[in-house]
Swiss-Prot record:
Binds 1 Ca(2+) ion per subunit. Lysozyme C is capable of both hydrolysis and transglycosylation; it also shows a slight esterase activity. It acts rapidly on both peptide-substituted and unsubstituted peptidoglycan, and slowly on chitin oligosaccharides. SMART domains: LYZ1. It comes from Columba livia. This is Lysozyme C.
Length: 127
């Protein structure tokens, strides 16, 4: 399903994302918009080596197990298919782990390209 922007803002605030790894909720909303278009079912194939799953586009090489990524680290200890359902609680735990280990949002290419260093106030405006 699509998670409406302001609902996502509420969910992220409730889960302590404001100020987490020094980033605002607006940064995360921008990341989600450009990674998955707010879709919980988002899927992206990166060729033979890995795939990205769910609203945060979590990668199968390092973070989740999809049964077809050779040498997957599965650092979030989760089946990738669980990252494409409507329950995003587990996605949130994994995304926080990724951000914590990176001390920021640099693992997400879309964040670096579209969000880093930009005015992101519009992502939370009116919520």
């Amino acid at each position: 399903k699509d998670i409406p922007r302001c609902e996502l803002v509420k969910i992220l605030r409730r889960h302590g994302f404001e100020g987490f790894v020094g980033k605002t909720v607006a940064n995360w909303v921008c990341l989600v918009k450009h990674e998955s278009g707010y879709r919980t079912t988002a899927f992206n194939n990166n060729g033979p080596n890995s795939r990205d799953y769910g609203i945060f586009q979590i990668n199968s090489k390092y973070w989740c197990n999809d049964g077809k990524t050779r040498g997957s680290k599965n650092a979030c200890n989760i089946n990738c298919s669980k990252l494409r359902d409507d329950n995003i609680a587990d996605d949130i735990q994994c995304a926080k782990k990724i951000a914590r280990e990176a001390r920021g949002l640099t693992p997400w290419v879309a964040w670096k390209k579209y969000c880093q260093g930009k005015d992101l106030s519009s992502y939370v405006r009116g919520c």
